[in-house]
Amino acid sequence: MVTVEEVRNAQRAEGPATVLAIGTATPSNCVDQSTYPDYYFRITDSEHKTELKEKFKRICDKSMIKKRYMHLTEKILKENPNICESMAPSLDARTNIYAVEVPKLGKEAAEKAIEEWNQPKSRITHLVFCTTTGVSMPGADFQLTKLLGLGSSVKRFMMNQLGCFAGGTVLRLAKDLAENNKGARVLVVCSEITVVTFRGPNDTHFDSLVGQALFGDGAAAVIIGSDPIPNVERPLFELVSAAQTLLPDSKNSICGELREIGLTFHLLKDVAELISNNIEKSLVEVFQPLGISAWNSIFWVAHPGGPAILNQVELKLGLNPEKLGATRHVLSEYGNMSSASILFVLDEMRKSSTQKGFDTTGEGLKWGVLIGFGPGITFETIVLHSVSTQGSFGIRDWDYNFGIEFKIIFIPYLVLGIS
């Protein structure tokens, strides 16, 4: 008779979770940041608020954003005038748009990831869908299974209202699913549109004005699985370890509330300082087992929360300017897309590494970090292990060495409960 331990061992994958494919999508409507203040104050019938408009222009000028993509076109906004008001009841109109467009945009990203993966959709065993845009039942996860034609037995997980750190959360969940379910292939989708946060300017809600200058629309999808099939599946990154950290006494620094007027966004002035002063604690937690403490020796996949946060993190950790290059590129080209942002950065990291001639997907480096932050303040930190960019498929020659490193370095920490 078999033992429970034997059953469990048979259920688990042998190797670490890997990123097997990445896909991204945006709405077709692109807005230029340099002309956005004029458009925003015109479409919201707020051109008489000249002082506020000048403040908004300065925010946009300092945002380090060149352009963003938005589903809300001028036509849609004119058809839904309450969305343009600062405090008008408009949740019904916003929900009608969200319920259709969030799964639809997610489908575009998912199809690109599946195309890169180049495997039949029937091999997808789990679906994790994440959005901060809204809530419905059945959720966007259900809608996406129908849009993609996934099997009825796919195990679904729906995550709502987590905010900007959620791109790390879904990867942490997908890692656990892949490593504890032999043969699992997890489709992860983050889809965000600004339909619930867009509103007209208000003199008493300056933090909302900051959000209007930063947030954009986008969806990203990744396929996660352990033990990739040699010569069939090509890993892009390995997910080595993951941690979540909650910063004490910071719950009101970043927060949002879903109300009749939509999702209200609150951002305190001390957010950049709080994040930069505490980010190293999260790094030490996951990299101490590896003996890594030089933050310029790893590649960086960081959430593009905003220029002030990136500048202070760079200064506090003494990072070389190029370390946050992929993050700054995504911020410049797309803005802050909440949960989807960090997956865009992951995609940019692997693409730019190849384009620049590096020999790994992590800018020629072996180890890297994916770090997200958002409401809580919550940090999601994942240790990444890059792979070769030389075109080899499946398990690489040095995967064996990585397995030895993992057992020697990490297992004692896990057994002893050291973090």
From Swiss-Prot:
The active site is at C164. Keywords: Acyltransferase, Flavonoid biosynthesis, Transferase. It catalyses: (E)-4-coumaroyl-CoA + 3 malonyl-CoA + 3 H(+) = 2',4,4',6'-tetrahydroxychalcone + 3 CO2 + 4 CoA. GO terms for biological process: flavonoid biosynthetic process; polyketide biosynthetic process. It is an enzyme of class 2 (transferase). PANTHER family: CHALCONE SYNTHASE 1 (PTHR11877:SF80), HYDROXYMETHYLGLUTARYL-COA SYNTHASE (PTHR11877). This is Chalcone synthase D. It comes from Petunia hybrida. The gene is CHSD.
